[in-house]
Amino acid sequence: MVLEFTKYQGLGNDFILLDNRQQTTPLVTPEQAIQLCDRHFGIGADGVIFALPGQAGADYTMRIFNSDGSEPEMCGNGIRCLARFIDHLEGGNAPGKTYSIHTLAGMIRPRLETDALVRVDMGEPILTATDIPTTLKDSNGQAVNQPLEVAGKTWMVTCVSMGNPHCITFVEDVAAIALEVIGKDFEHHPAFPQRINTEFIEVVRPDYIKMRVWERGAGITLACGTGACASVVAGVLTGHCDRLCTVELPGGCLQIEWSAADNHIYMTGPAAISFQGQVTL
């Protein structure tokens, strides 16, 4: 089978985008996605994203396979790339166009902005510990500033779901974290029955933070949109951050707002095409 694809990246978090509008099942299997994402023997990417027909009243449906073949509920950087890909498939739209996209995390609405930016209504954060899910829990039934033993050290963590689970911890120097060593220990900790994405945050000032991430199913990546959203929520809950905050990631910056008016998280960041091609499976 010859497969046409388009490669996109959002802050260096890169994806293979497939036009899957003609059928409701993904064009490739998780095993094939692993091959496509291989950076030595495949195209190379953090995941494969499928633009499927809409369901539940949505314009489109998004599914994604990670580079290890697992399927996350949603991906913040990925949905910005998908919005730009859909715009390309439809022949281009003026800035301000909004799409409704059905995901395993619910309905997400990205809006095209100028200068290749996309603003995404990410919905409300999930804070109830059992819904994230995590076995960590405070007296309010949330997991805010809770101790977690990892790699012989006690970390104070806050857990938030943006449709996918996140564990956030605040550190003095994010560059000093041996992410390649402890990332998997967090991901597979028994406190997280569905595994976890982990964000390490250095607060520069209340409206500016630095973040590094270990993504569930992908490992170290240059950016994570849902992680940036979850980190600002965690920062507000623990008194570290303002509700409007710039998040600096290795791949660039995202603007995150946790609106007090509607409790929704709004993420603004870039998405750009890298190249197009064909691959034989």
From Swiss-Prot:
GO molecular function terms noted in the UniProt entry? diaminopimelate epimerase activity
Q: Which residues form the signal peptide?
A: none
The UniProt catalytic activity note for this protein reads: (2S,6S)-2,6-diaminopimelate = meso-2,6-diaminopimelate
Database matches in PROSITE patterns: DAP_EPIMERASE
Binding locations of substrate: 13, 66, 76-77, 164, 197, 215-216, 225-226
Q: Where does the entry annotate site (Could be important to modulate the pK values of the two catalytic cysteine residues)? A: 166, 215
UniProt key word Secreted: no
Instruction: Name the SUPFAM superfamilies for this protein.
Output: Diaminopimelate epimerase-like
Q: Which UniProt keywords apply?
A: Amino-acid biosynthesis, Cytoplasm, Isomerase, Lysine biosynthesis
Q: Where in the cell is it found?
A: Cytoplasm
The transmembrane residues are none
Source organism's superkingdom? Answer: Bacteria
Name the pathway it acts in: Amino-acid biosynthesis; L-lysine biosynthesis via DAP pathway; DL-2,6-diaminopimelate from LL-2,6-diaminopimelate: step 1/1
Catalytic activity, EC: 5.1.1.7
Which enzyme class?
A: isomerase
**Single GO biological process annotation from the record:** lysine biosynthetic process via diaminopimelate
What are the coiled-coil residue ranges? none
Q: Which residues form the active site?
A: 75 (proton donor), 224 (proton acceptor)
Family listed: Belongs to the diaminopimelate epimerase family.
Q: What does this protein do?
A: Catalyzes the stereoinversion of LL-2,6-diaminopimelate (L,L-DAP) to meso-diaminopimelate (meso-DAP), a precursor of L-lysine and an essential component of the bacterial peptidoglycan.
The record's subunit annotation is: Homodimer.
Name by which UniProt lists this protein: Diaminopimelate epimerase
The protein's organism comes out as Picosynechococcus sp. (strain ATCC 27264 / PCC 7002 / PR-6)
Designated gene of the protein:
dapF
